[in-house]
C-alpha cells in the first residue's frame, strides 16, 4: 500500500455480532488507519466482544465500571526478554458490538460508518494518539476525519453527520 508499512491483523470474535462488518472490511480499516498514522509494522489483534467482557476490561484497566465502545492495549515487551525475542506485536483493540450498535442508533449514524470510526479510533489509540487535552484531540480527530474520508465515510464529528441517516458515499473499500 504505497510503500507504507501496514500491520498484520488478527480478528477474534468473542461475541455474536450479526450486524458487524465482515473481516475483510475490519482488516482494511485497521490497515488504513495505520497508514493514516504513518504506517506500522507488526501484529494487531482486533477482538469483537460483548458488553460483559468490555465492562470487565474497562473496570480492571480504567477503573470505569461500565461498558465502553473501544479499548486499546499497546503491547509492552515483558522485562528480561532480549530485544527482538518476539515477533513485532503492536497490541490489541477491543470493540463492543452492542455499544457500537447502540451509539450508532443514538447518534443517528449509519452503523457501518460508526464501526469504521471505532476501528480507526482504536488503531490511533494503539499507536499513541489520544484526546485527553484539546491539542491532542485536534490531532487525533483530524487523522480520523482524513482516514475515514479517504474510505468514503463522512466526518464522524460533524453535527450534520449526527443528524443524518444517509449512508456514506462508499460503503465498499477502495483497493
UniProtKB/Swiss-Prot annotation:
Signal peptide: none annotated. Its cofactor is Zn(2+). Residues 159-175 have a biased composition (Polar residues). Residues 154-175 are annotated as: Disordered. Keywords: Cytoplasm, Endonuclease, Hydrolase, Metal-binding, Nuclease, Ribosome biogenesis, rRNA processing, Zinc. GO terms for biological process: rRNA processing. Zn(2+) binds at residues 121, 125, 131. InterPro entries: MetalPrtase_cat_dom_sf_prd, YbeY, YbeY_CS. Binds 1 zinc ion. Its main location: cytoplasm. Single strand-specific metallo-endoribonuclease involved in late-stage 70S ribosome quality control and in maturation of the 3' terminus of the 16S rRNA. This is Endoribonuclease YbeY. It comes from Alcanivorax borkumensis (strain ATCC 700651 / DSM 11573 / NCIMB 13689 / SK2). The gene is ybeY.
